[in-house]
């Protein structure tokens, strides 16, 4: 057995020596051959004669001057470039600022927009962190998730940085579900949301479920939504938060319908542009009408008074008639759905309260105490250990909820309630003909001398 092992080691050493000598030489040859093979494949599909050829394709408008310059240099001005205004079937190229382009991951995952559609990436990049941070709403949980996200970004970007503290089975499980590159992209998209979550946590006075006053034994207090008799402010002012969520939903639905009207305008479909405007009237009319019916509730705010009831009813009636007139009788079936889409944004508060109440109950039992007695931590060493473990388990559970639920629900609100108002999708990605060169350089002039001769 030992002799066989030595023979195998000798073979490995010999192969390694061969690899060291020839691998650097083979790589550029392989790369150049792949490039030339792709060129030959395309050339076989061109319309051509002995002295000319015709090539048709898509190119971004901003790249046209560069294309003209390259053709002039390659052919000595012996070419003809014909532009067309035809946009049907054009591929889609997403162009967004660097800070926003990371959210293209979600747009591509859902469906690439068509070339003639509004690109929703900017809206997604602005709204998703707000939704995520609002539902998280705790300084401690947000800071912990932010730290993990920053570490993931660094670690995946530096795979040779040394051993990691994460268990092997956990790494294997995560990478089987989400590839490292996608995990890095997700971590980048969560970072702004965690920062927003820290800001909301300060406003809500929530630090791992405790208030700042509780953590500092009453020396420091800061909040924008005050607690009442030890009950978190998010619970005390739940009616106002729900109302704010409804107005957020109304705004998001309206924005989606405006985008839909813009899309229809670019398709020269005036009838459906009017249809989107009538849908906006329906959304505002039915929402304000419903709120005016409950304006007497003492916990509500920003609610219109009942004397405007007739105006809201007229908005709803005009909008409904207009929708049916522009989109057909079947659209009448969808009229109630507009209200459900607006009310869906109440889940923003629901996710927030689930985390707040869970943390409040666990912290009260373990540390703060309840109306029936003091917390476990005051009942001796054994109970103190139990209290610490209970708080730790609650924090871990809330962190897991804080990653999963705000992420899923934030994306869902944008995909379903917002995108459904304007988004068609099924776009074709712009994939320019070319090659990524790592070991070789293109020889443009030499490869086109026959065109210039």
Annotated model-derived regions:
Residues 65-453:
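Conserved, carboxylate-rich catalytic/transport cores that coordinate ions
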